[in-house]
């Protein structure tokens, strides 16, 4: 019996590995202030599920076959999300509630299974499914068939420039602001922005709407829309990095206004981590990981345009913008999990959301290739090879610039935004490269300096004035 117990004892490395992986895959909520929202309600959900199924099964009118199928699909999705709340991991985020991120992961699993299902259909069946969802898609036309691109580029007038500031320019701006919040690196954001414009050039022979005038690509897209969004997102990142996170309990707030503000702040991050994608002492594996990150990012963007071109629906259709919003939701935990896997030596496997996101990206590409064989038969392999080499070159150029900046202007001291309801520890280093020897300016783990520094920080937090749930000095 003793030998059996001893064989189950985990080593220190196993404990550290499980702790690091849990922080990105099963983040826990500490210092819970309202127990009701975090207490398990499995019996309640079971009773609700059984009663609701009995009600809809015996009371609704089932005379219309199409309504039966549609409502059956919605019910399957709804109850699958309930199972997601009960069984799936929280992921790296806990705000506004872990149940929300469990449902996001559940939706990503459903979308993954839907893509697998599409692979076993033919093109006519897929189109029939689309027409069943929206009969108006029978009359949809490709944008490339009714519009001209890159025409009279030498004619540059103020009226023509202003006409390009449409809803898509607005989407570019806010889209890049959100991307900057996720990536949190000027170098990588600008590299992805420039690389995407080059991607459009290399795939212009397949998608005519990628053709743009030079001033549209350089000035309007890269500098104004993308650049403005990157700047706004990074300003918000710097603001969140500089804040001191010390969340107060609802019980400690005695004013109605304070409780309302604290409830609103529940939808803000519990903490904010300064990221460092590349370190001068990082190994080649870190460089290859960032290159893979950029390839998957570009592939996900390409899928957006290939899907609507092959299956013929407008960019304004819900099939297009709902997919974009959905991909944006699952990208947030994916980037956090991939960054931890790439930079933390103790995290030796990717998170589940990151794994599912990668599969979704490649499955979408496979779906496009299967149902767009006529389109991809025109592919020029030389352009694809040049595109891969171009992405590799820009990646290495970006990383070299980041290393040069770090060596000449010094390393920025890493800051930890702590929160009382998180399990984040300042003793855990997030920016050691995989296979790297470690950075000299990073403090050793479990040192007295770290303990005293953490103690001083907790003392400082305990003395801070609590206002609307956030401690301010």
Swiss-Prot record:
Example GO molecular function: L-serine-phosphatidylethanolamine phosphatidyltransferase activity
Subcellular location per the Swiss-Prot or TrEMBL entry: Endoplasmic reticulum membrane
GO cellular component: endoplasmic reticulum membrane
Chain ranges passing through the membrane: 36-56, 73-93, 103-123, 187-207, 217-237, 287-307, 320-342, 356-376, 384-404
Gene Ontology BP term (one): phosphatidylserine biosynthetic process
N-acetylalanine found at: 2
Main function: Catalyzes a base-exchange reaction in which the polar head group of phosphatidylethanolamine (PE) or phosphatidylcholine (PC) is replaced by L-serine. Catalyzes mainly the conversion of phosphatidylcholine but also converts, in vitro and to a lesser extent, phosphatidylethanolamine.
Protein name as annotated: Phosphatidylserine synthase 1
Natural source organism: Rattus norvegicus
Gene: Ptdss1
